[in-house]
């Protein structure tokens, strides 16, 4: 059972978190539409780094402030994560979260650190893990291969480059696999691959989710430093190794036993992990707690 049932029988509005809630002119021109949002039965916030310890920052991922967030009051976190850009939660951020986030339900967060953040500002939260993991049941993971295949699709992260380590990763994959595919998740990833001088013989996958799904469904393995690229591969029942380049992957691997190798240890650890046999087992997901969280919303009712 996955998170999709929260939406299956309901009218859903989608608003981007990275753009401001609205301007006064937009409210005058689109008051009816915005009123539907303001009066929604449930407002769900999703996002890896939707929250931060200090919301007094330029271009916050959830682009709200204390003056314009009233329309989003009562928002409920769904598998939300938090970034740390200060040593503690300041007064402004605490006041903002207490104003905009619901006090009536328990929030769903993806890791213990985010749970503690919300608890520090006086809100209730359960660590349900990222909703993308909810379908990775023991029965699902049993269908994932224990040993490597002949082909692999890999990813890179252009905004977090490490040319020496990323070349080393590709070199390991060339030695272990007969055919390499590269999926550019964002617009600059292909240029980064080419800048490494490592694109020869690599087949480029269409830069869309459909393209990624298509190559995974051919039965290839996944190796790369795109966290959710790896999780998506697991959802498609493909063997996956995530290369950790930031705290998001490390936190989720620590809590849920995702198959992971540190980028700093690529040269020593990746080849052994690729070549060895191991089962995919996602630990730490509390299925009963997830069902308890969903039960707050009467999800079976249209």
Segments (PLM) and residue ranges:
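Active-site anion-handling motifs in enzyme catalytic cores
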Residues: 1-302
């Amino acid at each position: 059972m996955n998170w999709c049932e929260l939406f299956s029988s309901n009218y859903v509005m989608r608003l981007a978190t990275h753009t401001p809630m609205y301007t006064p002119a937009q409210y005058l021109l689109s008051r009816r539409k915005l009123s539907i949002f303001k009066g929604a039965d449930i407002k769900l916030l999703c996002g890896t780094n939707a929250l931060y310890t200090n919301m007094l920052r330029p271009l916050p991922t959830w682009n709200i402030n204390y003056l314009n967030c009233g329309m989003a009051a009562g928002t409920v976190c769904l598998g939300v994560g938090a970034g740390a850009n200060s040593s503690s939660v300041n007064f402004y951020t605490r006041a903002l979260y207490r104003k905009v986030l619901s006090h009536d339900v328990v929030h769903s967060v993806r890791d213990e650190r985010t749970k503690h953040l919300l608890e520090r500002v006086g809100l209730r939260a359960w660590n349900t893990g990222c909703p993308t993991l909810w379908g990775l049941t023991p029965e699902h993971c049993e269908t994932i291969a224990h040993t490597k295949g002949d082909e692999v699709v890999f990813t890179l992260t252009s905004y977090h480059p490490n040319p020496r380590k990323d070349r080393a990763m590709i070199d390991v994959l060339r030695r272990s696999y007969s055919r390499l595919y590269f999926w550019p998740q964002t617009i600059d990833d292909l240029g980064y691959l080419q800048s490494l001088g490592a694109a020869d013989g690599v087949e480029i996958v269409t830069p869309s989710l459909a393209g990624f799904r298509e190559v995974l469904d051919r039965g290839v393995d996944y190796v790369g430093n795109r966290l959710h690229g790896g999780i998506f591969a697991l959802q498609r029942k493909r063997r996956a190794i995530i290369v950790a380049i930031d705290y998001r992957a490390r936190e989720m691997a620590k809590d849920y036993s995702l198959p992971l190798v540190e980028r700093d240890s690529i040269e020593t650890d990746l080849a052994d992990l690729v070549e060895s046999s191991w089962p995919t087992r996602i630990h730490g997901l509390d299925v009963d707690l997830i069902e308890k969280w969903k039960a707050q919303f009467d999800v079976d009712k249209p």
